[in-house]
Amino acid sequence: MTIDRILSRREALLRMAGVLLVPALSPDFRGRGREPLPHPDPRPGITAAHVLSEDKLPARKRVREAFAAARERPELFDGIYCPCDCSKEHRSLLTCFESAQPTGCYGCIEAAELVTEKAKEGRSLAEIRAAVDKKYG
């Protein structure tokens, strides 16, 4: 094996490592660090009219409970940005639950559980946002 061949293999490996490392170091790949999430303002008079009904959901209890929570507290869910980012066109955590997307995304489900837990503790929207930012921001 010649020195040129060894260097070309080494160079190829370094280039491959760079291709893998550069995206991993970018803010979009890693998440936002500890910046606050871009939480939307809840829309006045928002309802859960568009949240998927129970008959359209899988039998998994955790999923059904998250959708039920979105139906019970649409004003809170509409003021929280969904930290999973799997559907960036969604306006808020509430709009995630207007589709079947959360049935396969435990990021949405976990965020819903956190919102529900903090609401049961009597936390305000600002406090719930801070808890979401602390966990996911």
Q: Residue locations for each model-derived region?
A:
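Short, thiol/selenol-centered motifs that function as redox-active sites or metal-ligating centers
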Residues: 80-115
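Short Fe-S-cluster ligation motifs
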Residues: 111-137
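Short, charged low-complexity linear segments at domain edges
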Residues: 50-89
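N-terminal secretory signal peptides
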Residues: 1-8, 18-23
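C-terminal segment of N-terminal export signals and the immediately downstream linker at the start
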Residues: 24-65
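Sequence context surrounding c-type heme c attachment/ligation sites in exported
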Residues: 74, 97-98, 103-106, 124-129
